């Protein structure tokens, strides 16, 4: 995962700088997210991985599927990624772009993963606590993972707050072993 992160970083930073220069962070966010969704499709992923399909054909297909909203600079971005065999990095590029965008906007991105579905009131309480702790606005994505058994794990910035039963059990097992 860190290799993908390392490879994607210069592309994410380049797109971010371009978006800032154009004063269009929201537009580029939408474009990069769309491209990440397209390359995540199983059929497109197979085409990208097929050495018999020329890189320029794959780029043309992706630009075509993305539509007019991509624009000339977006199409050029796809062509650069394709020529450098980096199309598969688009989901990670999108993630890093969103992190850079949130930083520029003064917000933090957080993912709350709980063992069970959270009510809106519970999510609002967690967001209020995170805002108070970090003194910044927080954008939240919520996910459910029954393997946590109970509680929740919050990933915000480069921090992880593990309040799950699974995490507590793992920490107890580690303490008993050491």
Swiss-Prot record:
Keywords, alphabetical: ATP synthesis, Cell inner membrane, Cell membrane, CF(1), Hydrogen ion transport, Ion transport, Membrane, Transport
One GO CC term on file: plasma membrane
Recorded superkingdom: Bacteria
Ion transport listed as a keyword: yes
A GO term for molecular function: proton-transporting ATP synthase activity, rotational mechanism
Subcellular location: Cell inner membrane
UniProt xrefs under Pfam families: OSCP
Transmembrane segments: none
Subunit structure: F-type ATPases have 2 components, F(1) - the catalytic core - and F(0) - the membrane proton channel. F(1) has five subunits: alpha(3), beta(3), gamma(1), delta(1), epsilon(1). F(0) has three main subunits: a(1), b(2) and c(10-14). The alpha and beta chains form an alternating ring which encloses part of the gamma chain. F(1) is attached to F(0) by a central stalk formed by the gamma and epsilon chains, while a peripheral stalk is formed by the delta and b chains.
Family of this protein: Belongs to the ATPase delta chain family.
Function: F(1)F(0) ATP synthase produces ATP from ADP in the presence of a proton or sodium gradient. F-type ATPases consist of two structural domains, F(1) containing the extramembraneous catalytic core and F(0) containing the membrane proton channel, linked together by a central stalk and a peripheral stalk. During catalysis, ATP synthesis in the catalytic domain of F(1) is coupled via a rotary mechanism of the central stalk subunits to proton translocation.
Descriptive protein name: ATP synthase subunit delta
Encoding gene per record: atpH
